[in-house]
Design a protein with these regions (language model features):
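Amphipathic cytosolic juxtamembrane alpha-helices at the membrane-cytosol interface
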Residues: 24, 28, 237-238, 289-291, ...
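Transmembrane alpha-helix signature in integral membrane proteins
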Residues: 197-228, 339
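Interhelical loop and adjacent transmembrane-helix boundary motif
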Residues: 27, 66-69, 365, 370-411
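Membrane-topology segments of multi-pass transport proteins
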Residues: 1-33, 52, 56-201
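Transmembrane-helix boundary motif in ABC transporter permease subunits
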Residues: 17-19, 23, 52, 214-245, ...
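C-terminal transmembrane helix and the adjacent membrane-cytosol boundary/short C-terminal tail
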Residues: 11, 309-320, 324, 393-421
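Membrane-interfacial helix termini and adjacent extracytoplasmic/periplasmic loops
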Residues: 20-21, 185, 255-297, 367-371
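Transmembrane alpha-helices
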Residues: 40, 244, 298, 304-309, ...
Length: 421
């Protein structure tokens, strides 16, 4: 059929258009079906966990769930003077209802994070429920207040009621503020946390210092090695690259254990240094920052070498030779002609190593000391030891946010298209 002889309005033209549209629809459907497994995998393994993490960082259901009537009674309270008798009546009703349930334990744990000792107050009060007068007579609101204060005088302290009032919502910035060494005072204003609780900004600072140091060490070692590999013949380059990739085939625990053997006081490194006469006493290389730097640099070095090598391999060697033939010094030609062309590899490698470094847990935990633990250690601590998912998610979410901000700033100022994939 010669389509050039078909009129635009003929039935054959309309049928041809329908067939073309159907073919395009089939192609789009096939493309979506091919991409669907990867999209579902990313959704379930990446998007949903991160979304859950960010959600748990601001969830605050314990008080609103266990004490709904009390929260409602305190909604109009000025938080300066003791609450009205109606608040005591509401608290008595709520605590009687949840006295023997799991909600009471969650309530006690949550309030104890606000005021140390609140857990014992909640437990003591729960044992006294329900409140009754003489001969099991019903109590008036004023008598209910008096009963609470008889159970424990702390119920007359405004601070304990403020802790309930400011956490009446299902969503709260409590954990995020705590991770930034801040808190809400009794009136809901954001203030600096107490000195004995202001530790997390220092931990974040330590994490980024270690990440930057490991990135610089990996760059200093990886750049010349990647350059040397790029100048080798293909056969020799493949052989050296196999040696570079060996750490990928070895468990992290095995590599860390090997460094423990090497760095200990009677290890190979100290033995060799003492035998050569360079030192007279063993160096302290374990359970401090030195051991962390050495092991993390070794483990992350391939992540720096691979992006650098891929970029260097694509740079024609004729550029440097041309610069030298025009009178440039060989080092000047290398520095001014060759190095700028490797910036994409430097950026990709540095970003990859840094992001991996700030999330490391097992290496600092085994080779570092108490002052060398990073944010990941405290995420694991709150997850596995104290079972404080809110704090763990807040620390993890802030670390993720800081990483994304640094990535965006890097891309903005360098104007390079560095991909994390």
């Amino acid at each position: 059929l010669n389509t050039m002889t078909i009129a635009p309005s003929s039935p054959s033209t309309a049928a041809l258009k329908r067939e073309l549209k159907a073919a395009e629809a089939r192609k789009r459907t096939m493309a979506l079906l091919l991409v669907a497994p990867l999209a579902i995998f990313l959704l379930l393994i990446f998007v949903v966990p991160i979304g859950t993490l960010l959600t748990r960082a601001v969830q605050n259901p314990e008080i609103a769930t266990a004490l709904p009537n009390t929260v409602a009674a305190l909604s109009g309270w000025d938080r300066k003077t003791p609450p009205a008798d109606a608040a005591y009546v509401a608290l008595a009703a709520d605590m009687t209802k949840v006295a023997d349930s799991e909600a009471m334990g969650a309530l006690a744990r949550r309030l104890n994070t606000e005021i140390p000792g609140y857990r014992s107050l909640v437990a003591k009060t729960a044992r006294a429920m329900p409140l009754k007068g003489d001969n099991d007579a019903a109590l008036t609101p004023a008598q209910t207040r008096a009963k609470f204060i008889d159970v424990d005088a702390r119920w007359g302290d405004v601070a304990y009621w403020q802790a309930i009032a400011k956490n009446g919502s299902q969503v709260s910035p409590f954990y995020l503020l705590a991770a930034l060494d801040h808190k809400q005072d009794g009136f809901g204003h954001i203030v600096q946390a107490d000195p004995d609780q202001s530790i997390y900004l220092a931990i974040f600072g330590r994490t980024f210092v270690i990440g930057v140091a490991v990135t610089l060490f990996a760059l200093l070692l990886g750049y010349p090695l990647a350059y040397w590999i790029s100048t080798l013949s293909e056969r020799r380059a493949n052989l050296v690259m196999i040696l570079v990739l060996i750490p990928f085939w070895t468990s992290v625990l095995v590599r860390v254990a090997a460094w423990i053997v090497l760095l200990q006081s009677e290890g190979l490194i100290n033995t060799a240094l003492i035998g050569s006469g360079l030192i007279s006493h063993p160096l302290t290389l374990l359970f401090n920052r030195v051991g962390v730097y050495i092991s993390m640099t070794h483990i992350l070095l391939p992540f720096m070498i691979l992006p650098l090598y891929s970029v260097m391999k694509s740079i024609p060697p004729t550029y440097q030779r041309a610069a030298v033939s025009l009178g440039s010094h060989p080092f000047a030609a290398f520095w001014r002609v060759y190095v700028p062309q490797t910036y994409p590899g430097v950026g990709a490698g540095a970003l990859l190593v840094f992001i991996l470094a700030i999330g490391y847990y097992i290496t600092p935990a085994l080779l570092g000391g108490p002052n060398d633990q990073m944010v990941s250690y405290y995420v694991a601590y709150f997850t596995n030891v104290t079972i404080n998912w809110g704090m763990a998610c807040a620390l993890g979410g802030l670390l993720l946010a800081a990483t994304l901000v640094l990535y965006a700033v890097y891309g903005r100022f360098t104007r390079t298209n560095v991909s994390l994939g």
